[in-house]
Amino acid sequence: MKIIVSLFAVTIFFAACKKENATTATIEFIEPLANDTIIAGDSLHVEGTIIGNNEMHGYTLKMVNETTNEVLMNITSDSHASSYAFHEHRMNNVTQISTIAVTISANLDDAGKQATKTVKVVCLP
């Protein structure tokens, strides 16, 4: 009988333990704004924050010219933190009117779960 009571107590103990909340993140762009137009010779300014409710496992900032499929920038941070600030510049040197997708992906855990936000701008030659 003592064994049954002990097993019952252990079962109740483990059942009462709460799982840690899944990590979530809010990604905010300060710049660029959606559909901004960047003229030739100007810099495409990318700035913003990633705020998580738990520790995250880094982030990636990627710029892709959707007109030519060229990857213009691909920066990865592997640092573990509950918040990040990103700030990058890239000179607009396109040779044709191009849509540029700026994507931030926050790595929420080691299993590959991500939060992602994309802003698209137009670059003029």
What is each stretch, according to the model?
Residues 106-116:
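Short acidic/polar inter-strand loop motif in beta-rich domains
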Residues 36, 45-54, 108-110, 123:
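Extracellular acidic, Ser/Thr/Pro-rich low-complexity tracts
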Residues 91-99:
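Surface-exposed, short loops/turns at beta-strand junctions within beta-sandwich domains
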Residues 115-123:
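C-terminal edge beta-strand
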